[in-house]
């Protein structure tokens, strides 16, 4: 089925969120356009909102937005919190737009294809920057490949790692396992060279999930796991010998095993102090936290005297918790955690109700969300424009892929 120009424009608007992600707040433009379109459409036809996918999208929005609303009433930084509460309202009509834009299977396939091509371009650009010292994002000036994101915005590794399932599974569906394996290898190399250890962990999660997805038996899964392990060891060993910058990051990571607190802090880039402070904030404000986006404003009151972040930034310390569970707990409290976990229980039940072939349609986005939320990792701030845009994009596209309830397993 061919899409009309209007339908293609809607898919293009949705795809543009990914396309503009490396360029700061530019990614807000298609979100606002989509939100305005949805508001106009709902005014014309309010009955359109009765579908199950709309209700699930509203639930996803509520689980994110209600915690910040409740946290804002006694926030330690009320202006910051209420501003965040107001601006995040844009995700509600954008949720409607996303479901509308992807109502047709052809639209969903088109979005996946365009997204896969975009991500492949990011991968090749990152590899070119590593090989030749320059790419579309500029020259290689730091100790990490930055790709299209640029040297002042080192987010390539985590973003590529999270989105890699889209490219790999599109390649698998269109061109077979050999081509998908080649795409996986290129993505792995780009994530490795990007140097973000959080990205490495996310990509490991993605790899395990992809192997489980394509393996026809436990024996094949174990065999694939062994091959992936050998390939990873070879790539890491080669990079360690050829790149002093990469070797330095590996050495910092291995410092975690020297048995000292200092070694652990070095390996975690001093995040252990942030996590302890976030935990203290959560205990001091158990119900609704210190207020959304108020973490930095309350950091000084809870940080230890020898906190490394106070030396780096005496006025505020760390900006966010660097872990999504601790971010939600410290900024929105137990109420926020309850909302987030309730949402994921509901989504898990929806996923469990899908037949095997229906799960294939949501597989790429399921794996991406798993990698994004994997708890044994570090994370960007989820209550921020950059990471929340990607989170909602993945979550809403996942919801839009779901078949009507009558087509699911009883």
PLM segments and residue spans:
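A juxtamembrane structural motif centered on a specific transmembrane helix
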Residues: 1-5, 177, 234, 353-363, ...
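Transmembrane signal-anchor hairpin modules in multi-pass inner-membrane enzymes, especially those
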Residues: 1-83, 102-109, 113, 117, ...
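Alpha-helical transmembrane segments of multi-pass inner-membrane proteins
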Residues: 15, 93, 107-141, 149-217, ...
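Membrane helix-loop boundary segments at the extracytoplasmic
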Residues: 18-24, 327-332, 363-401
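Perimembrane helix-loop-helix junctions
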Residues: 38-49, 203-228, 354
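A membrane-periplasm/extracellular boundary helix in multi-pass inner-membrane enzymes
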Residues: 193, 214-262, 266, 276-284, ...
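Long extracytoplasmic/lumenal interhelical loops at the membrane interface
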Residues: 262-273, 288-332
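Hydrophobic transmembrane alpha-helices and their immediate junctions
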Residues: 331-371
